């Protein structure tokens, strides 16, 4: 990782540590020879430490979030592998979404796509992103936050609008998102990408479906149901071909001149 001057941040942090060491050495020498410090000297030292902290803390924070993003991406890669194997076993069909749709946020939770895919990997599929700090995890009701990740609702055979597109119906599997990170507005285990082509109208799929509609932020022209900036301005996505990658949201859709935004990577029928 590099700073704005192109120098590795690890070296930058090391230089900061050396500088702090020099300041500390000077302070100890001053204390031994004079037996004390003046108020101005103490204020100067405090100011130097505050400046260094202001410089280094953002670097440490970014490094911590980068580590969380990598851990989340590892989760996504495992999901991609599991989904790809599931599709091969089920005649190119995709996993079901059987959470609490149509019954409200507190309705009984079905097995869901994560449990359907679990047998295809040796390790436990981790359903929570390290950076997902949604308060819904701690509200005492596990049904209100099923996972940090949602399945693209274009694919499952139990969900509109296509009612079960198969792998053969996906024009470009390497460019079609099947799993995205969910925001607080989606306690369910999937998101409805169908609404993304028209932010002024969100389709409804029955009672209780408002928990996972792809609602739009009219001011920003972007969805509020998917966590599009969870990791340093972007998020991790799983694609139909099984690979997972970090992207900024604007890389996952396209604006058609003279018309509203149209679905790009989220629609399996797009050319």
Question: What are these regions, as identified by a protein language model?
Answer:
Residues 1-37:
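N-terminal leader/signal peptides at the extreme start of proteins
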Residues 12, 19, 37, 57-60, ...:
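Aromatic-residue hotspot detector
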Residues 72-271:
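Short, well-structured segments within or immediately adjacent to enzyme catalytic domains
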């Amino acid at each position: 990782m590099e700073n704005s001057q192109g120098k590795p941040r690890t070296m930058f942090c090391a230089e900061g540590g050396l500088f702090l060491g020099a300041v500390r050495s000077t302070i100890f020498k001053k204390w031994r020879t004079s037996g004390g410090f003046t108020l101005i000297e103490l204020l100067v030292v405090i100011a130097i430490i505050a400046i260094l902290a202001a410089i280094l803390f953002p670097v440490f924070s970014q490094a911590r979030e980068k580590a969380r993003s990598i851990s989340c991406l590892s989760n996504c890669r495992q999901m991609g592998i599991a989904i790809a194997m599931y599709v091969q076993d089920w005649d190119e069909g995709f996993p079901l979404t059987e959470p609490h749709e149509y019954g409200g946020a507190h309705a009984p939770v079905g097995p869901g796509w994560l449990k359907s895919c679990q047998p295809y990997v040796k390790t436990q599929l981790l359903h929570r992103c390290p950076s997902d700090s949604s308060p819904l995890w701690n509200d005492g009701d596990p049904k209100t936050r099923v996972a940090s990740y949602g399945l693209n609702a274009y694919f499952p055979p139990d969900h509109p609008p296509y009612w079960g597109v198969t792998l053969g119906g996906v024009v470009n599997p390497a460019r079609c998102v099947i799993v995205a990170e969910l925001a607080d507005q989606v306690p369910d285990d999937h998101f409805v990408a169908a609404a993304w082509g028209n932010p002024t109208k969100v389709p409804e799929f029955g009672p209780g479906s408002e928990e996972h509609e792809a609602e739009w932020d009219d001011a920003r022209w972007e969805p509020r149901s998917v966590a599009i900036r969870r990791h340093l301005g972007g998020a991790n996505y799983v694609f139909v071909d099984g690979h997972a990658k970090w992207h900024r949201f604007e890389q996952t859709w396209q604006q058609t001149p003279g018309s509203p935004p149209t679905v790009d990577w989220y629609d399996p029928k797009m050319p």
